[in-house]
């Protein structure tokens, strides 16, 4: 459950290490984002040699949340951290590697490139 001012780890090698959610996309009054949702975020911590610099406003897809997600079969899944992958305007990831597990809901949201790069899909 991600909302404005929530800080997320970045799960790719784009150069950013931590981002802060500015806005949840998908409606003017939408407050929370879950796995598979797109957010607008500001880069708070970044590597100096990375593609994405500190202070840049980016779009990102939430791939892991600490708040549990209920699946269709009734099972619950949750992760140890809140994490996102930075994407471009064509919904393709900027980085070439994804770190850590990615939720299956990312596949249902249509981000197949992220799922194929992920080492593990839960």
Curated annotation (Swiss-Prot):
GO terms for biological process: translation. Keywords: Ribonucleoprotein, Ribosomal protein, RNA-binding, rRNA-binding. PROSITE patterns: RIBOSOMAL_L14. GO terms for cellular component: cytosolic large ribosomal subunit. GO terms for molecular function: large ribosomal subunit rRNA binding; structural constituent of ribosome. Transmembrane segments: none annotated. It comes from the Bacteria. The keyword rRNA-binding applies. InterPro entries: Ribosomal_uL14 (IPR000218), Ribosomal_uL14_bac-type (IPR005745), Ribosomal_uL14_CS (IPR019972), Ribosomal_uL14_sf (IPR036853). Disulfide bonds: none annotated. The keyword Signal does not apply. PANTHER family: 50S/60S RIBOSOMAL PROTEIN L14/L23, LARGE RIBOSOMAL SUBUNIT PROTEIN UL14M. Belongs to the universal ribosomal protein uL14 family. Binds to 23S rRNA. Forms part of two intersubunit bridges in the 70S ribosome. Part of the 50S ribosomal subunit. Forms a cluster with proteins L3 and L19. In the 70S ribosome, L14 and L19 interact and together make contacts with the 16S rRNA in bridges B5 and B8. This is Large ribosomal subunit protein uL14. It comes from Sulfurovum sp. (strain NBC37-1). The lineage of its organism: Bacteria, Pseudomonadati, Campylobacterota, Epsilonproteobacteria, Campylobacterales. The gene is rplN.
């Amino acid at each position: 459950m991600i909302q404005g001012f929530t800080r997320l780890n970045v799960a790719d090698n784009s150069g950013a290490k931590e981002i802060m959610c500015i806005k949840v996309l998908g409606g003017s009054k939408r407050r929370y984002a879950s796995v598979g949702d797109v957010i607008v975020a500001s880069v708070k911590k970044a590597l100096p040699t990375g593609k994405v610099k500190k202070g840049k406003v980016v779009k990102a897809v939430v791939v892991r949340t600490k708040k549990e997600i209920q699946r269709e079969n009734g099972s619950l899944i949750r992760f140890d951290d809140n994490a996102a992958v930075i994407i471009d305007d064509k919904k393709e990831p900027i980085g070439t590697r994804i770190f850590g597990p990615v939720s299956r809901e990312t596949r249902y949201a249509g981000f197949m490139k992220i799922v194929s790069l992920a080492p593990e899909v839960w």
